[in-house]
Amino acid sequence: MTNSISVIELQQKIDNQEDFMLIDVRESFEREHFNIGGLHISMQTVFDRVNEIPKEKIVVLYCQKGIRSMIVIQRLSERYGYQNLINLQGGMDAWLKMKTQ
């Protein structure tokens, strides 16, 4: 089971300046349209760049809808033993919806 965080909880982490890492697993063209920051490691390159993903701090991964980031988390957990990865529920779609309300 993948750990997840809501957009409201993520906003609170950002506001409280908590120590965590943010990773966008979308493609470059999606990120250019809109992003909330963090390191960009597309789903296609994540295993080539696994050494950039720490195991000693919380890492929140996001994509457009929360599906690709969930898949990446499952694969990283299975292959490399990560236990510190959290999926942003609803991804950028949920983030944009929250910001427009």
Spans of features found by a protein language model:
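Rhodanese-like catalytic fold shared by cysteine-dependent sulfurtransferases
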Residues: 1-21, 25-60, 65-101
